[in-house]
Amino acid sequence: MSLFLGIDTSNYTTSTALYDSKTGEMVQQKKLLPVKEGQLGLRQSDAVFHHTAQLHTLIEELLKDVDTSKIAAIAASSRPRPVDGSYMPCFTAKILSSAMKIPLYTFSHQEGHISAALFGSQRTDLFDKQFIAFHVSGGTTEAVFAKGFGTGFSVELAAHTLDLNAGQAIDRTGLMLGLKFPCGPQLEQLALKNTEKIKVKPTLKGCDCCLSGVENLSKKLIDEGKSPEYVSAFCLKYIEQTLSEMTKRLLEKYGELPLLFAGGVMSNQIIKNSFEEKYNAIFAPPQFSADNSAGIAYLGYRKYNNVHTRV
């Protein structure tokens, strides 16, 4: 048996993935949650309902031409972070595991992002090393000091936002510009058309950041009649400079460790290009950077392989 099924549910996306450990191929099926125009997200109860409905369709599509007897294990995200008191429902994964009589391994959504970024960037060597990992999305903006132990990661919070998450700042700015949620890709396209110079001054407290100013300043620029292209570029520049200053301070604190960036915001090419140039940072391809279950599926493979190697 060489196949590993991964399931992940986040604030914005329902994701499934199938990893073939013989060929190294990763196949994904994912779908955004249905958010009404002008809204910033869903209530938790509504999100759970839609995740459950979408998972059935996605899994059926993912496995339609697959010999399911070759699935060795299922892996699912059961909590946002690898810390106590953190929880996400994974009912579908439990039902499938029981029905198929195969192991179920659970990991955190954050571990999944880190794993996907390492897999996608072909840096799986870091599963056994120390590094600094940023997880920057609509639900999280933080950096952790990560220690890989082969089948997962122990993490120590190193820095985080004190108010808005980066993805929230992007979406709120985008909605003020009349864009459709989630606004990241549209905001990036507008920003790329800007030709004016932009200066920003990020706000940090130690290694932690404050991003609520992005929303307020973007609104001020809109009220002043600045173009959507300029406002979009300003928003992304502010976030890029904030993350850059956080990175600089963390390297001063922890030393010259490898830098990994994951999460939907880090699939933005403007930010990505800047960080690759400044810090030689590790990024995953876009399909492994935004919310996905590929990292969860790969963690399931590593866990299964570790357990059965020791037997």
What are these regions (language model features)?
Residues 113-117, 284-311:
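Glycine-rich phosphate-binding/hydrolytic loop that grips phosphoryl groups
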Residues 76-79, 137, 260-268:
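Glycine-rich beta-strand-to-loop/alpha-helix junction loops that act as flexible
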Residues 88, 104-112, 135-136, 161-164, ...:
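Active-site nucleophile and cofactor-binding loops and adjacent substrate-binding regions
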Residues 2, 6-12, 17-19, 27-28, ...:
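A short helix-loop
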Residues 1-2, 106-132, 298-302:
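Conserved phosphate-binding catalytic cores of ATP/NTP-utilizing and phosphoryl-transfer enzymes
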Residues 189-259, 265-276, 280-283, 301-310:
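A contiguous, well-structured pocket-lining segment that forms one wall/lid of small-molecule binding clefts
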Residues 76-101, 269-277:
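Short Gly/Thr/Asp-enriched flexible loops that form oxyanion-binding sites at enzyme active sites
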Residues 2-76, 80, 109:
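N-terminal beta-alpha supersecondary unit
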